[in-house]
Amino acid sequence: MNKRLSRGKISLLASVFVTTTFMGGVNVLASTAKTGIRDITSQQVVKEMKVGWNLGNTMDATGGETNWGNPLTTHAMIDKVKAAGFNTLRLPITWDGHIGAAPDYAIDATWMNRVEEIANYAFDNNMYVIINLHHEDGWLKPYYANEAEVKAKITKVWTQIANRFKDYGDYLIFETMNEPRPVGAADEWSGGSYENRDMVNRYNLTAVNTIRATGGNNALRHIMVPTLAAAALSTTMNDYIVPNNDSRVIVSLHMYSPYFFSADLTSQWTTATWGSDADKAALSADFDAVYNKFVKNGRAVVIGEMGTINKNNLDSRVKHAEYYAKEATVRGITPIWWDNGYCVAGKEQTFGIFNRKNLTWCCPEVMQAFIRGAGATQTQTSYSLGDVNKDGKVNAIDYAVLKSILLGTNTNVDLSVSDMNKDGKVNALDLAVLKKMLLS
């Protein structure tokens, strides 16, 4: 999705966690198994990806990581996502605003470092990571008149990204673009014109060729490549061209389906109810169209974005999440939930299911249904950071328990919930961080 949220209060806790210093060069923190390219197909990779979660409205936020109301990303956040059963992190990134002038289009080193730092949080959890070009609509225009300029910039930008990550293994997946489309046109979301679709194919080819040309592991890296607007429409799928018929290209689609249930709140057609036999048949038909076009013909597919907004309709959302994940998985397709961090019910764009400020699932039933439908499993019984007494809530009682630990009257210490600043110790600093969390 590409609508920004209104600015929210930034968590005071977040700044405590982000202290990693980069020493230059490629900083591969993942295990050895993640630093090689295996002899497996893209379909096998997608099967291993299982089910995913988007770190939305964060590194894709224009102006900076916290500009759209989410806190700084921490290792603990990604730990929590992995523990819930998600095996893939999609990391949407807006590079525009962090790119220098032509002809070099140099990417700001601090921004590149931060991207790598967050990616490594997921690699440390043995997760797949997807890195893309996200809100680049200001320059990535799908028109013949813009072709030369756009291709030059794509080449420079992807060369820098690909070189930075070329030593990472096949748990890292590149995605050429997010939702390339004719922004502002009447047919922006309904397939665009032939010119638009043709230009998206050309830009995808430029990106894939650029990535492959950097060599190293990028020569065989699996790359996600979208249709126009990443839409699963007959026009966009029929005019889609796989760059070079590359066997390691994965089709990237976004399916907020059915739209008026999943993503619409204000139109006359909006609905908060889903789950009838007719509803299920219609959603299955959407997946059949994707399967018959691509998967049946040996082409791997990832649904890079899906989700439902919170309309105070928990029962329908749970039914939809489980059925959606099941229908995708049985067809060999990985679904990835779009989480923009916005959990408040009854407002537009409330796709959030995870509260990153207190590390709790704001819609646990929806999350569990999604995981269940995909056949994934939780890796462990996990508790939120700060839930010192492990009762499933973070509140003043946890503050009292942590204080008793520091006073020596309680020796039952679990670093995973008590070490608030992740420095390997439990002391007064952690008590201060917990206090800030409770007050935020």
UniProtKB/Swiss-Prot annotation:
Keywords: Carbohydrate metabolism, Cellulose degradation, Glycosidase, Hydrolase, Polysaccharide degradation, Signal. GO terms for cellular component: cell surface; extracellular region. GO terms for biological process: cellulose catabolic process. The keyword Signal applies. Residues 1-33 form the signal peptide. Up to 32 AA of the N-terminus and 52 AA of the C-terminus are not required for catalytic activity. Its EC number is 3.2.1.4, 3.2.1.8. SUPFAM superfamilies: (Trans)glycosidases, Type I dockerin domain. Gene3D superfamilies: Dockerin domain (1.10.1330.10), Glycosidases (3.20.20.80). Belongs to the glycosyl hydrolase 5 (cellulase A) family. The gene is engB. The keyword Hydrolase applies. The lineage of its organism: Bacteria, Bacillati, Bacillota, Clostridia, Eubacteriales. Residues 381-440 form the Dockerin domain. This is Endoglucanase B. It catalyses: Endohydrolysis of (1->4)-beta-D-glucosidic linkages in cellulose, lichenin and cereal beta-D-glucans; Endohydrolysis of (1->4)-beta-D-xylosidic linkages in xylans. Pfam families: Cellulase, Dockerin_1. Has endoglucanase activity on carboxymethyl-cellulose (CMC), xylan and lichenan, but not Avicel.
